[in-house]
Amino acid sequence: MSDAVGLTAAQTARILPNGSALAPASAPAAVQAAIAAGNAIDSYPYPTPDEHYGSLAQLWPAYDCSGATSFVLYGAGLLSANAETSTGLETFGDPGPGRWITLYANSAHVWIVVAGIAFDTAEYGGAPVPAGSGPRWRADPLANLGDGQQYVVRHPAGL
């Protein structure tokens, strides 16, 4: 995982044509680290049903929604090296949306919004860039609400 992330003067993150994201220069270090973590896995595939992985301290060959969200939180220093399930992330942090980071979780799916852009494995937020089935940055942070499911909204304390 890279410790560096490109920065933008904008107040929200910006997605580049190659699919990686730029963090706002004004964002806290944890937010910039979260975007760097997402960039590190933004072209990884979605795993097959029988693939399961361990510690977040090493890169996995594939990421599902909870693995990707856990990796971003871990990269930001907000989660231990143990990946959480989407159900486990329903109780992460504090209730409600955050200023910089917000999670949307239920028993079947989870995604994370960092500095105004979503990091997700579902395609409600537009076509994935780069193409593929795994985690990608999405410009519309709330597009997944279009799936008709109910989500618990959480955020890390202070963010």
Predicted regions and their residues:
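Intrinsically disordered, low-complexity
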Residues: 1-48, 129-159
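Short linear capping/connector segments at secondary-structure termini
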Residues: 16-20, 49-56, 88-89
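Short, flexible coil/linker segments at or flanking structured domains
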Residues: 19-22, 34, 51, 92, ...
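Solvent-exposed, acidic/flexible segments
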Residues: 24-31, 58-66
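Generic structural marker for isolated residues within well-ordered, non-membrane alpha-helices
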Residues: 35, 69-70
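Active-site nucleophile-His-acid catalytic modules used for acyl/amide transfer and hydrolysis
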Residues: 39-63, 82
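...with weaker cross-activation on analogous glycine-rich loops/strands in unrelated enzymes
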Residues: 63, 70-159
